[in-house]
Amino acid sequence: MYNKHHKTLKLHIKKGDTVQVLSGNYRKKQGTVLKVFPKTYRAIVEGVHIVSKHKKPTAKNPQGTIEKVEAPIHISNLMLIESATSRPTRIGRKLDEEGKLQRYSKKTGEFIKNG
């Protein structure tokens, strides 16, 4: 699954980013990243990969329910949507004026604001 000796995993997707799905049943669908799981290289995207989750009957709810929830999708199937052009773009990393490593759009060369 993942390398347990790897200390920090650098991902091109962060929570709050708007992304587009590249392949699978939800191809070309866009949504906001709700949660990222760096160890398994997966993310939960709003409105993408909806699955039915069956809840057991309980004292409060004797009938039981079937809920629709978003399931994680692999990060390699996601591409960031650039806010200026509203189109998918590849991401790179380079130093900014302050000497910090920042994400930037490989299409336009502009830095991407975090969050």
Swiss-Prot record:
Belongs to the universal ribosomal protein uL24 family. Pfam families: KOW, ribosomal_L24. PANTHER family: MITOCHONDRIAL RIBOSOMAL PROTEIN L24. Part of the 50S ribosomal subunit. InterPro entries: KOW, Rib_uL2_dom2, Ribosomal_uL24, Ribosomal_uL24_CS, Ribosomal_uL24_KOW, Translation_prot_SH3-like_sf. The keyword RNA-binding applies. One of two assembly initiator proteins, it binds directly to the 5'-end of the 23S rRNA, where it nucleates assembly of the 50S subunit. GO terms for biological process: translation. The keyword Ribonucleoprotein applies. One of its GO terms (cellular component) is ribosome. SUPFAM superfamilies: Translation proteins SH3-like domain. Keywords: Ribonucleoprotein, Ribosomal protein, RNA-binding, rRNA-binding. One of its GO terms (molecular function) is structural constituent of ribosome. This is Large ribosomal subunit protein uL24.
